[in-house]
Amino acid sequence: MLAFVKCFSLKRAKHPRGYEDPHVLASETPFTVNEIEALHDLFKKLSTSIINDGLIHKEEFLLALFRNGSMQNLFADRVFYMFDRKRNGVIEFGEFVRSLSIFHPYTPEHEKSAFMFKLFDLHGTGFIEPHELKKMVGALLGETDLELSEESIEAIVEQTMLEVDTNKDGKIDEEEWKELVAKNPSILKNMTLPYLKEVTLAFPSFVLDSEVED
């Protein structure tokens, strides 16, 4: 009996910290089991790019997903924060899949909208204040080739607050945010990554050795 328990423990030890059953993740996200297997191969590549511990550290995350991976950027930091659901400074496989699923084409817009609201709510107060909006607009511009002056960014923020803050309390609440998104659906454009609909085609080399079937 003891030998059996040891054998079972050794078998379970093959999975790194944070690993979750693909079938469970498939039941909670738009991804299929095979797609999650493909994402696991991608996750392994990312999580060993700098520190080989089966977890994605911020440096690895920024290097893989942002063109200015070596630079500090509030937007990049916020995305990492949102992926790090346990708030322990690293991204585990389950967190990676669940957070990435927000960007899936089949994920409802209200979920994408809620994710983006939290992204902009820097202090977690349930509101987006003008200074938070200004910081995030500047950070988003940092990921593009578009350069705007401080005055231009402030003008964008002032105009947005004027149009969105309907109850005139000086901040944007969740209902006001929903109305903004409803009137301007293009706001969520970057919240959808089309290739996630066909992960196994986007990353064909990752699934050659997969033995999992849906």
From Swiss-Prot:
Ranges where the EF-hand domain occurs: 35-70, 71-106, 108-143, 152-187
Organism: Arabidopsis thaliana
Domain of life: Eukaryota
Binding site for Ca(2+): D165, N167, D169, K171, E176
CDD domains with a match to the protein in the record: EFh
Family: Belongs to the calcineurin regulatory subunit family.
Predominant subcellular localization, coarse grouping: cytoplasm
Functional note: Acts as a calcium sensor. CBL proteins interact with CIPK serine-threonine protein kinases. Binding of a CBL protein to the regulatory NAF domain of a CIPK protein lead to the activation of the kinase in a calcium-dependent manner.
One of the record's GO molecular function terms: calcium ion binding
Residues carrying Phosphoserine: S205
InterPro entries found in the cross-reference section: CNBL1-10, EF-hand-dom_pair, EF_Hand_1_Ca_BS, EF_hand_dom
Keyword 4Fe-4S (UniProt): no
Keywords: Calcium, Cell membrane, Cytoplasm, Membrane, Metal-binding, Nucleus, Phosphoprotein, Repeat
UniProt key word Membrane: yes
Protein's name in the database: Calcineurin B-like protein 8
